Amino acid sequence: MAHPFETLTPDLVLDAVESIGFLSDARVLALNSYENRVYQVGIEDAEPLIAKFYRPQRWTNEAILEEHRFTFELAECDVPVVAPMVHNGESLFEHAGFRFTLFPRRGGRAPEPGNLDQLYRLGQLLGRLHAVGSTRPFEHREALGVKNFGHDSLTTLLEGNFIPKSLLPAYESVARDLLKRVEEVYKATPHKNIRMHGDCHPGNMMCRDEMFHIVDLDDCRMGPAVQDLWMMLAGDRQECLGQLSELMDGYQEFHDFDPRELALIEPLRALRLMHYSAWLARRWDDPAFPHSFPWFGSERYWGDQVLALREQLSALNEEPLKLF
């Protein structure tokens, strides 16, 4: 059976955009996106638009609209974020069975790893994001947890026959040991779940004209604030300590941070590793994935994963990062 995205042709993309009143110039450029499909669409006598077509069956309409409302709330509080465009009071549209949203085109550069000045400004931006995010919970979007990101990911991988038989016992053993330790640290660490970005890697924090702005809130969910912070750090432990200090200096100008949450950095890193592999497995019926990730299923990939999980298990037994 053909995957739904195989029917999403350039003509259909143009028809969708024109169905809500825009006149295209027939130019369509596919952008780098796997979970959804994202296109730059040329518009007659105007700037191009970005059209995002949501993966069928992933989110409910309520969950998508809750993401949009969060983005609008951030924008209303002057947090620099790329918000959906609104047409006739709506931000979520449907055409030929596909749900889609339009965004203004907003380019930029990702932050430089370890740049302390940029980390201070990123901290300010994330503090503002979380100041808004902490005011109320999501109602239609799942939270980040050990079960859905960890145990459910392992179940997907074990039941899907993706791991080579030669490495299956080693992967399953270290994964179960790791999840047990992650659960222990989670239970022992006080933390508060807030609305957060959820996938806050440097590529989703773009700089243009010396100002950072937030993009792609597709994975926003409830979770601990530190989830949006740890991926900003790069390098060895000593480098990360200096970077963390700058990040926190900026962050705490706008929102309080509980330093006890720093103990969750390595558990969250472990969950992200497992969830990424499970994400690839769950999307394998989409032809774009075998084409773009041909190494998934290879002994080398899974051997590297076993090593990475073992390293995470060791990291979980080390002293967590602390603020100066």
Region locations from a protein language model:
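A glycine-centered beta->alpha junction motif in the catalytic cores
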Residues: P56, F100-P113, L154-I163, Y276-S292
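A cross-family kinase active-site recognition segment
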Residues: E112-P169, H191-N193, F293
